[in-house]
């Protein structure tokens, strides 16, 4: 239990809480003998083993860009990822949780340098061997310039990323899809 002396102080674990919970559930299920499953908890996807036919689990990366009518078609994917046993796919983006005021869209991922919604990209997908780490990285990388995020991801072992930019182009880390 954590207590704060200042009653106005709050701790929001939203950027890692779901990923951590998914990882703990997956590990508990594996410890109890589950050998094949794909957990999907609100966009945090975690592979347990392989599919029953021994093939890899495949997860889609949502399309973060609106169509001609301004609608977001998250049923369309811009890429798919083959997840190895124990791998997770976690995506952070500006296209699901937002509101619009005077034609300006405000989403929930805040850039700490501006205290405004981060505007470096539309979405970033992270593949890692820990869903909690993937969740933290997807939020953090979303809130930093692409070049800094690329440098960070390339320094990490067993972590890959796909960036979806506002000009509808994509950048990927050196090991994405391999």
Language model features: what each stretch is:
Residues 1-178:
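Mature catalytic core of soluble alpha/beta enzymes
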């Amino acid at each position: 239990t954590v207590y704060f002396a200042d009653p106005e102080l709050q701790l929001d674990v939203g950027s890692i809480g779901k990923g951590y919970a998914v990882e703990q559930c997956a590990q508990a299920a594996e410890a109890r003998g589950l050998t094949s499953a794909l957990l999907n908890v609100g966009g945090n996807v975690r592979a347990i083993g392989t599919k029953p036919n021994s093939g890899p689990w495949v997860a889609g990366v949502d399309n973060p860009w609106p169509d001609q009518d301004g609608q977001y078609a998250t049923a369309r994917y811009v890429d798919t990822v083959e997840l190895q046993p124990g791998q997770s796919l976690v995506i952070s983006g500006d296209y699901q949780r937002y509101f619009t005021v005077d034609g300006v869209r405000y989403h929930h991922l805040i850039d700490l340098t501006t205290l405004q919604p981060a505007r470096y990209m539309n979405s970033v997908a992270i593949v890692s061997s820990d869903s909690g780490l993937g969740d933290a990285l997807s939020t953090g990388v979303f809130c930093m310039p692409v070049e800094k995020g690329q440098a960070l991801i390339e320094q990490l072992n067993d972590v890959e990323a796909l960036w979806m930019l506002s000009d509808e182009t994509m950048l990927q880390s050196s090991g994405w899809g391999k």
